[in-house]
């Protein structure tokens, strides 16, 4: 029975991956930064800046895709009776690990999702990120096998699970109303100034959120499941994203293979690898990549909501203290922070 179910799920997961890859390329066509149709880390970073939690003027914009991801997941979970508020599993640990995951992502300049999209755009620097990401996941799996756990979560009242989606609706209202206390990157002032129209971004987020909720897509979970159980279906979804985005980039002329001159990327292979090693390691301990955490938060999981707040805090720390990389390369502060993060996760 389980094998039959898996056979039915796999084509759907692959189909969802193809659609998500197409949507990611379309978002670039409609205005998002190159190789950044979707990037959970970057979009959370931009939103954090827009809300005033960091002062990096080049990366400040409330990204509707994030709102859409959460609401798309929430709506489908409610429709399929999978909205099940839970939480209380090591919230402080999740917050701190989330911070370090973001610091690792901003060393690499992208989350696991963007890593795939960078590869699809011909950015060979992402190969080093992928190698580090795999190493980090293997390290996390090692600790899981040794018995590491953040302990069980507990059933909560529906209102608890609904708080995070409601917060996202509030953030969307702030984007549309654009009050003076919300910060936006000026035209041509950096990646924050490049974005698709609000409606297009929101619809894209809703679609991807719903698909990710239904398929349980997770880059970290996909690789973890291959290592632990020999189960490929989740990973096939991300391979489908890679292939469809690659084809889309070639059709639209966005495929530019090479190392130098890649958009919002640097060529330091060592720190690309170490940044994603930190991200992969932390995500295994958390039980999912940043995309999966947003989807779970939309389903009412307050542990994942805490993790998302940790990711946003990590973005604020990274930009306020000079930890984030730029196209010119990593910073000394960022290098130190990544090493500290790896040590903290190991300990």
What is each model feature region?
Residues 1-347:
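Membrane-interfacial helix-loop segments of redox and metal-homeostasis proteins
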């Amino acid at each position: 029975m389980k094998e039959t179910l898996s056979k039915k799920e796999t084509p759907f997961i692959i189909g969802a991956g193809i659609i998500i890859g197409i949507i990611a390329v379309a978002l670039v066509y409609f205005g998002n930064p190159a190789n950044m149709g979707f990037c959970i880390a970057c979009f959370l970073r931009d939103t954090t800046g827009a809300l005033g939690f960091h002062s990096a003027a080049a990366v400040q914009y409330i990204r509707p895709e994030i709102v859409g991801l959460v609401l798309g997941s929430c709506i489908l979970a409610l429709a399929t009776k999978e909205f099940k508020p839970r939480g209380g599993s090591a919230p402080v640990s999740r917050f701190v690990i989330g911070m370090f995951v973001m610091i690792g992502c901003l060393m690499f300049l992208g989350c696991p999702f963007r890593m795939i999209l960078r590869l699809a755009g011909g950015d060979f620097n992402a190969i080093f990120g992928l190698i580090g990401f795999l190493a980090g996941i293997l390290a996390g799996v090692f600790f899981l096998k040794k018995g590491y756990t953040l302990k069980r979560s507990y059933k909560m009242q529906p209102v608890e699970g609904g708080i995070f989606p409601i917060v996202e609706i509030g953030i969307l209202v702030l984007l549309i109303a654009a009050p003076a206390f919300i910060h936006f990157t000026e035209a041509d002032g950096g990646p924050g100034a490049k974005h698709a129209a609000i409606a297009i971004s929101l619809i894209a987020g809703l679609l991807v959120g719903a698909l990710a909720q239904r398929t349980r897509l997770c880059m970290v979970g996909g690789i973890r499941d291959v290592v632990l159980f020999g189960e490929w279906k989740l990973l096939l979804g991300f391979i489908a994203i890679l292939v469809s985005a690659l084809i889309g980039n070639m059709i639209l002329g966005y495929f530019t293979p090479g190392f130098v001159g890649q958009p919002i990327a640097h060529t330091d292979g060592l720190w690309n690898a170490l940044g994603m090693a930190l991200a992969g390691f932390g995500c295994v301990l958390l039980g999912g990549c940043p995309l999966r955490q947003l989807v779970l938060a939309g389903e009412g999981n307050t542990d994942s909501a805490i993790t998302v707040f940790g990711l946003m805090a990590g973005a604020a720390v990274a930009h306020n203290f000079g930890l984030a990389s730029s196209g010119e390369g990593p910073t000394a502060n960022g290098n130190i922070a990544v090493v500290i993060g790896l040590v903290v996760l190991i300990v």
